[in-house]
């Protein structure tokens, strides 16, 4: 197939790209001269971004809008931050942050999606495959992996087990979840908003919490386990026979 783009159009596009690259490099050099450590030309920084001296910006990082990065932060690699504040000493690794405020000495990522109006206090950890939105986290919270927290207010030093979900939307309206200080949210807990978990309360793994959990209480909402003796035996015999046949075929 013939290339329908004229030489003039290609030259104009090349000039535009070269100009954009030159402007981007000027911004990088200005930040480096101001004491920011930038280790790769793959970094993109918008003109209105403010970065304190001593921050480290790693390869593949994109800083957009009116983002502010504090001293001693390590941003990247492969991180996108837009219209957000990241306070001093925080790390944001391979994650995306939009219109939010990350507090000091936070550890964000990898693969964390911090959506609009997320606010974190000192020492918060949002780990792998965690998504937050319109939520406030007091100091010292740990949300390590595979969790969604939306429209929530979380007290200090809470721990969220893997698979926690705040069920904040009923198809029409959004509702808030309130979690007190020093709470322990067990793995695969569903918190059906509006709901409150009191200070120092626990939720048992696998629970769907639809009512408030009082302070210092254990909220548990799941069926009791029943074991049916011998139920698996005929299934297991057929399964083992199938695998033994496969082994013989593979050994030929």
Predicted stretch roles:
Residues 1-3, 81, 155:
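Intrinsic disorder/low-complexity segments
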Residues 18-21, 25-28, 39-40, 45-46, ...:
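Short amphipathic alpha-helical surface micro-motifs
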Residues 34-35, 39-41, 80, 96, ...:
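Generic structural motif recognizing short loop/turn segments at the entrances and edges of beta-strands
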Residues 1-42, 46-49, 54, 215-252:
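Terminal amphipathic alpha-helical/low-complexity segments used for targeting or macromolecular assembly
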Residues 43-46, 50-126:
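Acidic, glycine-rich loop-and-beta core segments that form the ion-binding/anion-interacting portion
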Residues 30-31, 36-38, 53-54, 71, ...:
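General secondary-structure edge motif
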Residues 9, 92-252:
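Glycine-rich hexapeptide-repeat left-handed beta-helix
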């Amino acid at each position: 197939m013939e290339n329908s783009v004229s030489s003039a159009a290609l030259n104009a596009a090349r000039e535009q790209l070269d100009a954009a690259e030159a402007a981007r490099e000027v911004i990088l050099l200005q930040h480096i001269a101001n004491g920011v450590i930038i280790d790769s030309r793959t970094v993109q920084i918008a003109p209105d971004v403010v970065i304190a001296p001593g921050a480290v910006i790693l390869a593949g990082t994109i800083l957009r809008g009116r983002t502010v990065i504090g001293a001693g932060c390590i941003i990247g690699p492969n991180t996108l931050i837009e219209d957000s504040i990241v306070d001093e000493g925080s790390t944001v690794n391979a994650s995306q942050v939009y219109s939010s405020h990350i507090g000091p000495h936070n550890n964000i990522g990898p693969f964390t999606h911090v959506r609009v109006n997320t606010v974190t206090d000192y020492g918060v950890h949002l780990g792998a495959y965690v998504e937050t939105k319109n939520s406030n986290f007091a100091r010292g919270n740990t949300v390590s992996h595979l969790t969604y927290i939306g429209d929530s207010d979380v007290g200090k030093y809470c721990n969220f087990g893997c698979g926690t979900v705040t069920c904040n939307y009923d198809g029409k309206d959004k509702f808030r979840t309130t979690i007190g200080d020093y709470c322990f949210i067990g793995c695969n807990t569903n918190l059906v908003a509006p709901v409150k978990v009191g200070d120092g309360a626990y939720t048992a793994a696998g629970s769907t919490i639809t009512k408030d959990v009082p302070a210092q209480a254990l909220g548990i909402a799941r069926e009791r386990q029943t074991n049916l003796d011998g139920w698996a035996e005929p299934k297991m015999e057929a399964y083992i026979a199938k695998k033994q046949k496969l082994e013989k075929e593979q050994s030929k």
